[in-house]
Structures are given as structure tokens and as C-alpha cells.
């Protein structure tokens, strides 16, 4: 069989706008529900959600029949962990808190086989090779793998141009929450200096010929970042959407109850 294509990587190269959603429930059932909704991509979070390699595998299998592409965020840029994630079939990998070009180069090496990298060969044990059903996987795997590095600290912003220019880095993703916190604004990315840092990072990424993405659940933020040149934007978080919908639903009934209690008693006998 042929090596599965990576439509997300191809779309990034065509500079298409891609709208995504954060997936934090860490269950295949929830991931599959999200995959039916039509988002271009979903971020399966291995950093802040309670995921492990087996739970990530289950979610990859659950969403495989659908068009929504799974991007998996590792908990950290560990070479051994990256090997495991690629072996279970991750094609698009996001790594948090990348601050230097050297870090980015090491991540590229972790995703490639020798002599261009250090990825170990799992052969017929791995889902990525479809258990040895994909011929020449070792030689061609890099063609369909996509590496996204996260810039989410002042140090990362300072080195954004060098990071984005690293060969093998396909895209940069900005983390506004960590960036703003690192700049002394406790998660408030609306502050002027944080916005300027985001803009500079987008510009540096585009100047290197790479795609830039960001998390922006608020529509006005998402549209502004798109105007600046971001092409893949996460516009929602599944856990937040569930909580907001649950609160809004209950609020309608609480409001009705309060209105009923405030109404005068009927004088009709």
C-alpha cells in the first residue's frame, strides 16, 4: 500500500486558510465527534490534556475515517517520545516552547531516519508503516511528516526568524497564553506589547517562507491574526465550548425560574 498522504501539509504549502479546534477531552469518542463537524484540523493535546501515547493512538484511529486532520501536540520535544508518536501514526507534530534554532534542528533530526536524523527503525511493529505494508517507508516518510514548532516565550520571539528558517520546520504556531504570561501579563494577550510580539513573529515566519498559526477562540482576534497572515487558526476549544453551552442552556431555565418567582400571584379563582 502507499504511504498515506498528509493533506494538512499540502494545504499549508498552498497557503490555504485552515480552521481548527482544540481537542482536550483525551478520549477517542469525543475526538470522533469533533471530527464529524467539518473543521480542517484538530489539535489533539498531549501537553495539557491527560493524554499518553496509547490514548493518542486511540484518537488517531477514531478520527482516521474523517477529513479533519489530527495535529498532535507532544508534551515536550523529547526524541524518544517523538519516535513513539511517529510510530503510532502521527503525521503532523506540534512541539511546545521552542526557543532557539538549535532546538528546532534537533526536532527535525528526531523526525528523520539516519543519516539525516536519529529516529529509530521500528519496521513491522509500527502503525506508521502499516506494519510493513508501506514499501520504502524509511526512505519516504519525511515527505508526509509535518513539524510545527511553537513560539510562546519572549526568548522564542527574539529568535523567531532563525527558528522559522530551519530546514525541516514546516510551520510556526504562536501560543498567546504562555507568551503573554512570560511577558508579565498573566495570560492577557490583548496587551499592546504582546500583540506587537505576535505580529513580529508572524512577519518573521512569513519572511522565512513558512506557514504561521495561532490559537484564537475569540472571533475578533482570529480575524485580526488572519489579516496579519496566519493561515491555520484554532478558533475553538472543545472543553470550553461544552462548558459555555452547558452554562448558557442552564441560564435560560434559571432566568425563566427567576421571572416566574417574581411574577405576582394570579387573582383568578
Swiss-Prot record:
The keyword Metal-binding applies. Keywords: Lyase, Metal-binding, Pyruvate. The record marks 87 as: Increases basicity of active site His. GO terms for cellular component: cytoplasm. Its EC number is 4.1.2.-. The record marks 73 as: Transition state stabilizer. The active site is at 48 (proton acceptor). A divalent metal cation binds at residues 152, 178. The keyword Lyase applies. It comes from the Bacteria. It holds the Pfam family HpcH_HpaI. This is Hydroxypyruvate/pyruvate aldolase. It is an enzyme of class 4 (lyase). It comes from Delftia acidovorans (strain DSM 14801 / SPH-1). Aldolase which can catalyze in vitro the aldolisation reaction between hydroxypyruvate (HPA) or pyruvate (PA) and D-glyceraldehyde (D-GA). The condensation of pyruvate and D-glyceraldehyde produces 2-dehydro-3-deoxy-L-galactonate as the major product. Has weak activity with hydroxypyruvate and D-glyceraldehyde.
Amino acid at each position: 500500500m502507499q504511504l498515506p498522504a498528509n493533506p494538512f501539509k499540502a494545504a499549508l504549502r498552498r497557503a490555504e486558510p485552515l480552521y481548527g479546534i482544540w481537542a482536550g477531552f483525551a478520549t477517542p469518542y469525543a475526538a470522533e465527534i469533533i471530527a464529524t463537524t467539518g473543521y480542517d484540523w484538530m489539535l489533539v493535546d498531549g501537553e495539557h490534556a491527560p493524554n499518553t501515547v496509547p490514548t493518542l493512538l486511540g484518537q488517531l484511529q477514531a478520527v482516521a475515517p474523517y477529513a479533519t486532520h489530527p495535529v498532535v501536540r507532544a508534551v515536550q520535544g523529547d526524541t524518544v517520545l517523538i519516535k513513539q508518536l511517529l510510530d503510532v501514526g502521527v503525521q503532523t507534530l506540534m512541539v511546545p516552547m521552542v526557543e532557539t534554532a538549535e532546538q528546532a534542528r534537533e526536532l527535525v533530526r528526531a523526525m528523520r531516519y539516519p543519516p539525516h536524523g536519529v529516529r529509530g527503525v521500528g519496521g513491522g511493529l509500527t502503525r506508521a508503516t502499516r506494519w510493513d505494508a508501506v514499501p520504502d517507508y524509511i526512505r519516504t516518510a519525511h515527505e508526509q511528516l509535518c513539524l510545527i514548532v511553537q513560539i510562546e516565550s519572549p526568548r522564542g520571539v527574539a529568535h523567531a526568524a532563525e527558528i522559522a528558517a530551519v530546514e525541516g520546520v514546516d510551520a510556526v504556531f504562536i501560543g498567546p497564553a504562555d507568551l503573554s504570561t512570560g511577558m508579565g501579563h498573566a495570560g492577557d494577550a490583548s496587551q499592546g506589547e504582546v500583540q506587537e510580539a505576535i505580529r513580529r513573529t508572524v512577519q518573521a515566519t512569513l519572511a522565512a517562507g513558512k506557514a504561521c498559526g495561532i490559537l484564537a477562540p475569540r472571533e475578533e482576534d482570529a480575524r485580526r491574526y488572519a489579516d496579519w497572515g496566519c493561515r491555520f487558526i484554532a478558533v475553538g476549544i472543545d472543553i470550553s465550548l461544552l462548558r459555555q453551552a452547558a452554562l448558557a442552556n442552564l441560564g435560560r431555565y434559571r432566568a425563566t425560574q427567576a421571572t416566574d418567582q417574581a411574577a405576582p400571584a394570579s387573582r383568578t379563582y
